[in-house]
Each structure stands twice: as C-alpha cells, then as structure tokens.
Design a protein with these regions (language model features):
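Short linear sequence signals and composition-biased patches located at protein termini or domain-edge surfaces
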Residues: 134-214
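Type IV pilin-like appendage domain
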Residues: 80-158, 197
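Aliphatic-rich helix starts adjacent to a transmembrane/signal segment
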Residues: 4-65, 213
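Aromatic-acidic/polar surface patches that form glycan- and anion
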Residues: 43, 80, 165-167
Length: 214
C-alpha cells in the first residue's frame, strides 16, 4: 500500500469519526462527555498517523537506493520555509520499495478554512506533492505546522532559508497542532458555547541519516 493511499484512508476515517460524534443519542450529560473524550482520542490518533508519515519522509531526505544518482545529500533540500519544504529523495511509489530514481517531495500548508469538512475555521490542509503530480492532502484537523531549521552547529537558520544556505541544513524541528474538525457542545443549555479538542506534537531536531554522508 503506497503512502498516498494511506493518507486517503486516514482522511476518510477521520471525517467519518467527526461525523459520528454528531449522531450520538445518549443522555445529554453522557453525550457531552462522550463527545469530548472521543474528540480527544481522535485528535491523538490523527496526530500519531501524521507524525509517522512526516518522520518517515523527512528521515529520507537525500536518500536514494542508487547513491550515484544522488551523491551529495547537501543538495537535497530545494526549498525551506516555516511552513513548506521541498526536497529530493527516493520514494516508494507503488508499495514495493524505493526504485532507485530520484523523486521530489513538497510539503506545504494551505490557508485556514480550506479543509471543507466540519465547522472548525482554523483547520488547514497539509499538502504533499510528489514530483509534478497534483497536490494531494486530507482534512486531518491540522491547525499549525511549523518547521525550524538548524545547522550542524545548532545555529537556527532564518526562514525562508536563502538558496546559498540550504546546504547548511543539518536538522529540522517539526511543530504541529491538530484540532477537532467539528465542535463539541460544552453545555446543552448553551449550544453556542463550543470547543475543539486539540493535540500538540513537536519533534526536536529530526536529522536524516543521509546527512552523515557529508
């Protein structure tokens, strides 16, 4: 199963989960508690799946099954900004493993309210673009996605990272927040008082193993 198929399945499951919360028919108090607890659980599960995908992709920055086709990992990062990054790697496009050909992978964060499902205006889509294919992304409840870049000497690089400084990137810190796409009522007597459960994750100094080749 390819990574894009996994993304689509995650998105479908998450949207179903949000809609399921609306159909609960238990008592008012129990329904409210259930909505909150399920919302928190969905946020955590969603965050776990997203982090798995990001860690997998980012750890392969500069990787190629045929090293001669990407001999210098220093040149693998093509663009680096606070909420977008483009780099070279060797992707598993058909579920059989990397094929030894260099691919480009581009992540970028869409605008608030573009997710299209649910009523949370803060939710965004994190797009993943493989080579020159159309942008693909799912409504996974992302509200914040921030990248911070460090040199080998732990100096922070200013974003957007200048073209001449891209080769200085040695590690990346990923910060990400997700929220419910559908609000849970806090009180039956005040239906307009709503809340969105949230979860936060930060990966400190993720470094591709391929940087060791420098």
């Amino acid at each position: 199963m390819g990574l894009q198929t996994i993304i689509d399945l995650i998105g479908s499951a998450v949207i179903f989960g949000w809609l399921f919360l609306i159909t609960i028919t238990a008592s008012s108090a129990n329904r409210e508690d259930f909505q909150v607890s399920q919302g928190e659980l969905l946020c955590q599960q969603n965050l776990v799946e997203l982090t798995k995908l990001l860690e997998y992709d980012f750890r392969k920055i500069g990787y190629c099954k045929e090293p001669d086709r990407l001999p210098n990992p220093t040149l693998a990062v093509l663009l680096a900004d606070s909420s977008r990054i483009k780099f070279l790697t060797d992707l598993d496009l058909d579920g059989t493993g990397p094929d030894g050909f260099v691919d480009s992978l581009y992540y970028y964060l869409g605008p608030p309210g573009a997710a299209g499902a649910g009523n949370n205006p803060r939710v965004r889509i994190l797009y993943r673009v493989v080579n020159n294919q159309p942008a693909a992304g799912s409504s996974l409840g992302i509200t914040n996605f921030r990248l911070t870049y460090y040199t080998r000497f732990n100096d922070t690089l200013v974003t957007p990272v200048a073209q001449a400084d891209l080769q200085k990137i040695f590690s990346i810190q990923i910060s990400m927040s997700v929220e419910n796409m559908i609000a849970s009522a806090v009180s039956e007597t005040a239906p307009l008082n709503t809340q969105y459960q949230s979860a936060f994750w930060q990966q400190r100094r993720l470094s591709s193993r391929n940087y060791q080749n420098r």
